[in-house]
Structure formats: structure tokens, C-alpha cells
Amino acid sequence: SFACLRHNCLLADSCPACRSPQRAVPASVALIPVPGLCAHKLIGCHGRGVTRCGTELAVAPSLPLAHDHPILKTQQMIDAAVFTGIARTGIYGRAPAPLSALIADLCALGGRIMRYPNLDELRQLTSDAVVAEFLAARKEATFGYRGVTADSSAVASGIAAAAAGSILGAANTAEAAGRMRWLIAFNRHNGRSVSATSIGWGRGISAALRSVQLSALSSYLSVSDQLRYRTHSTTPRRPHPRSAAERARWLPSLLWPAVCLNVRCDGVGFGQVRSALAVAVVLVGSRITLSAAAELLGAATSARAVSRVLQRVGRSDSATGVWRTVEELADLLDADRSPIDYARRRTLSCGGLLPESVWIEICLSSGISPGRALRLALARCWLYERITGSPGSRARWAMFMTGPTNRAV
């Protein structure tokens, strides 16, 4: 505890006379403590039979707080979790966490906040008076003879808990991530490493806090890493090592047109967008590289081409919606796979696809001219793309559709 909910104030943790923290060190075995009185030795006294301070601790001044102060709200959240053994509010609403996880989350966030304190942000989160009290305690810890340490005082614990509680008390992951971004930006501005692999800040933290951390870090990640960590989903998480190969089996090399119609990417053809987004679906939640993901889909594109398209989409206004759709599609394929095994279809030769006699019969029955060989090649390439999910340009008949002699069909 760092605050009193009955009197709406910060707890006092040091003697008003000798400034010694209470119960910081074990008392002498020869001493019988008197409740309510300071049991520390008077300054300058030595030995066992020395005079104790004996100051009445009830007269120690305490800092009053408004009834809705963030420090008191965080204390209420902790007390409720202690009473039930489970944290159910804020980011834990969708996935309740045990008390141990809540304490670990508070320690992880609070420790990082107080290790590199941004006083302007802390003043906004608490108040000028609370921060002034903390600065006074820190100054006394630095220059005082028997001063309390700033990081062990009630005011420091209250500030750390309030700052952490403002994040943990958010209604959802996105809101909590928005409240955490100042902390990540401040750390990076001061040269501290903050990455997806080093952002834990403590052991035993909850999955909910890890999701918030990854979501807050999203703008500092490359597009491929955003997909790997699912930063645009409701529950960002670490990549899984075995999710890519199975998912790629049920994906066409060119992502379904209906999924890609609303993607705006200037200077990039629709086929390139489809092939890049298919690779993006494979990347979601996996550690696979761009080149390996493209290979799983039949090498219809290259890692460099995919990277270029993803970067361009990432700079568009609709990027967040596109990545969210890609992540939702990946989750859908993991839960309920596609009815078509595209990995098997990619191995089909399709050598006897649409014989010329059948093509002529179709054209005559439809009242159109069969045209030259180019028209038949175009129809075969279109069928190849529809059946295999791979680009029609990879079909054996595509050679008839290229070259300077190519004319309108």
C-alpha cells in the first residue's frame, strides 16, 4: 500500500523527527517496539542500549489527495485484486489475470517509468504537489544523512503505480497502447533500447500487458514485423514458429481479388498487390522471412517486390485497415482452413487445359470468333490463374502473349 483510501492521502513512511524509514531494517532483539512510536536510534547514538527516537508517528504530515486521484484509483484496483485474487478491470476485462500478474505488470511499468522519469508526464498524471514531494524525497535521499531512498518512498510508489495504473486501467488494448506511447517515445529519445524483443521490462507479466506493449511499439516496427507481432489486432502477441507453412497451403499465390479491391497503392499493379498481400498473410504471427514466405506460395514474387509493395501500402491512409484485414484473414485460415488445397494445385501441370477443339466449340456456340492463337493463349492463362491461384504469366502459354508482334485479340 502507498495510499490510505479512508483518509484519501498518501501514506507517511518516515519519522517526522529523524526522517528514518520505518521497518526498513530489523529491530534489535533486545528492543521491545512501542506501536506508534519511532524505534530507530537517535542520530549520533551507537550501541545496543542507546536512546530511541520515540517520536509519535501519528504526527507525521501526509499529502492529501482528491477522492478521484489516479493514485487512489490504482490503490483501489490493487485492493480489489487482493480481495478476489484476480484482476478483472481495465485491460484485464477480456482476459482476467491473477494477482501475481497484476503486481508483475505494475512493477514492470512502474520500474521503467521511475528509472527514466519524465516529470512533465508525471505531473499531468498525478499533480504538481505529488511530483514536488517526490523530488524532495529524492533530494533528501541524495544529500541527507539518514534519508529514505526515493524509489522506496510511498510517494515514489504512488507515482509509479498511478502512471502504470493509467495504462492498465484502459478499456482496451488500443487505448492502453495510446497511453503508453509517451513512455516508449521518451525512452527512445534518450537512447534506451525499446524493441519487440526487449520490451518485456520484467518477468511474469501478463499476456494483456505484452499485447499493449507490442501495440504501442507498432509505429516503430517495419510493416513485416507489425504483421509478425499482429500489432493491429485486438491481442498482439509474439510470433509462433510453426504457423506459416500450414497456412500457406490454403492460400493462392495471388490473394483473392475481393480481399484486395479496396487496397490503394499508387504506382503498383493489382497483380503485384495481390501477390504481396498473399505473402503478408503468411507473415502474420510467424518468424518466417519474406523470401521464405514467397517460396511457400510458389515464388510468384520476390522478397524485394513484396517489401516495396508493403511499404507503399503502409504509407497510405488505409494501411491500418488493410493490415487488420490481413491479420483477421490469417486467423480465419488458422481456425477454418480454405476448402481448396492451393499447395497441391500449384503442382498441377495443366498441360491439357482447354484443348483447341473445345475452345472453338465454345466460341461458335457463343457467337464469337475463336480468333488467333493469342486469344486461345489468353483464355488458357486466365483459366490457369483461376484454377491454381498462381499468376497467369507463369503458364506455359504466356509466351504467346509477349513480344513486339503482340496484337490486339
PLM regions: where:
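Basic, alpha-helical nucleic-acid-binding regions used in initiation and control of genome expression
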Residues: 1-409
